[in-house]
């Protein structure tokens, strides 16, 4: 009992340390907030973080089934997410950003305890369990040897640890409130199945099934990873023991039956909601195998040492880890557009095996050399995690995160979003004007409507041109956005864009907070005073511009009236 309490205490300390370290980038970003700005409490992949906040916002508004408010197309909402329902209810009490990070930290804690439970199932020695837990929480790949992420090399031409946080426990801990709990469920499911293989106890198979069912609701892609891994473990047991375990196969089938309903429901959603099906089919192919393996870093060669020893010793728990890793790799090669998403969790069994291999090598050394060896291995495993965080932090002075979206909004931009939240309805479509200075923050990305992702996340209404993956036909919609705001476009064409897309509000960057126009392409979007070319200026004091034509003509030819005005943003309502 005392030993168990000590072990739980150690795990809690590791969980607390990971929680703190994973929160540090956000805290630094918060205290670095520029004057006149508001921090969004997002940093990595703000695009997807905004999607999660949108789901939470919908729950706070009383919505049970999820809607994709980054799309204006009709949709049949049949999906719900238990985790984000919980966070959405919490957000109604404490606000979206705080609930977002509470969810992230709870997920991190659950993940660390799940990894500790796995270590206890693999290693008998308490010290070895602790080392395995530490190494698994810290390990990353060899991406740092390639100089960091390169947009030019894309997502298939460089080590995966540079752009896939799913394959690093630490990066998952920093990333979002979705990945950590999903990864924790993967670990719980497979660990429970490993325990079921060892004991043939029904209770472990039931836990594996329940964890997989929850995973199917929260992050359904990963169910394929779990099921293939369980299948590989099951086959490994029969091959090593040279017998067909009918009871174990029945337990596996039973666990699958328990897990099936939630995944079947998601599949049903793809049949009845073409919009969801198109979004789920976003092309995220797995990188070439050598980039995948390099992305696992030093853990891979050390794991090979462990597997070699496990085969000789017929050490089934460690061979189960190898089977798990093979199942994860196989799932990432299935003929689906979302291949690489299924690599999440593959680093867990590999890191456990790596520590086993490291301990084996260490036993052959004397004196301080075992400690030096283990310390060196940990140091070699850390740099990509550090580089990943440093890369995002280095972009903060330019008001950019890991993508081109802005971590900081000006106070008037935040006020505009608050106005939309108070006055707009959930299905009101908002057309967001392009930012002609976006390329200054994120080279190579010009004329991005940087406020668009925040419309569903903060205001809780629908956006026309919002998200590269969630918005159907995103490229065509960005083209329509630029065309609408181009000074050479006729009012007839603009009116057609408004009517065809049922636009209710147009959000226009009145005075861009990041400086005057510097882009030759974007210069045509504005008059010299920064106001829209196509809306007559009634008066201007250099900071605030009123664009409601004249007292005798309160609505401009496009059927829009100004309903909100601030230093940086104008909002126009389409009234006819």
Ranges and model annotations:
Residues 204-212, 250-257, 311-334, 353, ...:
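Transmembrane alpha-helix segments characteristic
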Residues 367, 372, 376, 380-576:
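Extracytoplasmic
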Residues 28-48, 163-177, 267-296, 317, ...:
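Membrane-helix boundary/interfacial segments in multi-pass membrane proteins
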Residues 48, 211, 215-316, 336-338:
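Transmembrane catalytic cores of multi-pass membrane glycosyltransferases
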Residues 108, 224-226, 338-366, 372-377:
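Hydrophobic/aromatic-rich transmembrane helices and adjacent perimembrane loops
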Residues 171, 190-192, 204-220, 231, ...:
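Membrane-interface alpha helices of multi-pass inner-membrane proteins
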Residues 181-204, 309-313:
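Membrane-interface transmembrane helices that cradle and orient dolichyl/undecaprenyl
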Residues 20-187, 220-224, 395, 402-407, ...:
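Active-site lumenal/periplasmic loops and adjacent helix-entry segments of GT-C-fold
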């Amino acid at each position: 009992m005392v030993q168990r309490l000590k072990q739980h205490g150690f795990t809690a300390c590791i969980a607390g340390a990971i929680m703190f370290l994973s929160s540090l980038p956000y805290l630094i970003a918060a205290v670095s907030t520029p004057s006149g700005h508001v921090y969004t409490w997002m940093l990595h992949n703000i695009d997807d973080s905004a999607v999660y906040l949108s789901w939470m916002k919908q729950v706070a508004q009383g919505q049970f089934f999820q809607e994709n408010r980054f799309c204006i197309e009709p949709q049949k909402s049949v999906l719900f997410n238990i985790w984000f329902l919980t966070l959405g209810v919490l957000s109604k009490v404490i606000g979206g950003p705080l609930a977002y990070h509470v969810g992230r930290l709870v997920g991190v804690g659950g993940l660390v305890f799940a990894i500790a439970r796995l270590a206890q199932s693999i290693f008998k020695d308490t010290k070895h369990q602790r080392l395995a837990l530490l190494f698994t929480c810290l390990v990353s790949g060899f991406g740092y040897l390639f100089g960091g992420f390169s947009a030019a090399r894309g997502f298939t031409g460089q080590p995966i640890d540079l752009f896939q946080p799913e394959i690093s426990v630490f990066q998952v801990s920093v990333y979002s409130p979705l990945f950590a709990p999903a990864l924790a469920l993967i670990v719980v499911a497979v660990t429970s199945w490993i325990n079921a293989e060892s004991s043939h106890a029904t209770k472990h198979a039931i836990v594996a099934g329940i964890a997989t069912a929850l995973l199917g609701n929260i992050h359904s892609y990963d169910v394929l990873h779990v099921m293939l891994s369980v299948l590989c473990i099951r086959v490994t047991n029969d091959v090593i023991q040279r017998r067909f375990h009918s009871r174990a196969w029945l337990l596996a089938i039973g666990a699958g039956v328990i897990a099936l309903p939630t995944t079947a429901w998601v599949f049903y959603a793809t049949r009845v909601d073409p919009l969801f099906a198109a979004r789920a089919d976003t092309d995220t192919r797995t990188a070439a195998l050598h980039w995948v393996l390099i992305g696992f870093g030093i853990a891979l060669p050390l794991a090979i040492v462990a597997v070699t020893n496990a085969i000789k010793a017929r050490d089934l728990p460690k061979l189960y880890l190898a089977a798990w890793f093979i199942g994860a790799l196989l799932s990432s090669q299935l003929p689906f557009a979302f291949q690489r998403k299924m690599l999440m969790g593959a680093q867990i069994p590999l890191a456990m095996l790596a520590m086993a291999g490291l301990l084996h090598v260490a036993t052959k050394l004397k004196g301080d050399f075992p400690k030096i060896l283990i310390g060196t291995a940990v140091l070699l495993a850390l740099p990509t995690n550090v580089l990943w965080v440093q890369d995002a932090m280095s972009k903060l002075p330019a008001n950019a995160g890991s993508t081109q979206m802005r971590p900081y909004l000006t106070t008037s931009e935040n006020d505009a979003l608050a106005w939309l939240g108070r006055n707009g309805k959930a299905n009101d479509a908002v057309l967001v004007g392009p930012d002609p200075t976006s390329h200054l923050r994120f080279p190579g990305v010009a004329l991005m409507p940087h406020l668009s992702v925040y419309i569903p996340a903060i205001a809780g209404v629908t956006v026309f041109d919002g998200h590269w993956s969630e918005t159907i036909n995103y490229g065509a919609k960005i083209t329509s956005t630029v065309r609408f705001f181009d000074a050479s476009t006729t009012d007839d064409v603009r009116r057609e864009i408004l009517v065809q897309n049922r636009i209710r509000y147009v959000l226009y960057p009145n005075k861009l907070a990041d400086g005057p126009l510097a882009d030759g392409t974007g210069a045509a979007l504005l008059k010299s005073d920064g106001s829209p070319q196509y809306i007559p200026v009634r008066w201007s004091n250099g900071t605030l511009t009123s664009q409601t034509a004249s007292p005798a003509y309160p609505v401009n030819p496009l059927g829009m009236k100004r309903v909100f005005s601030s230093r940086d943003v104008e909002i126009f309502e389409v009234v006819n």
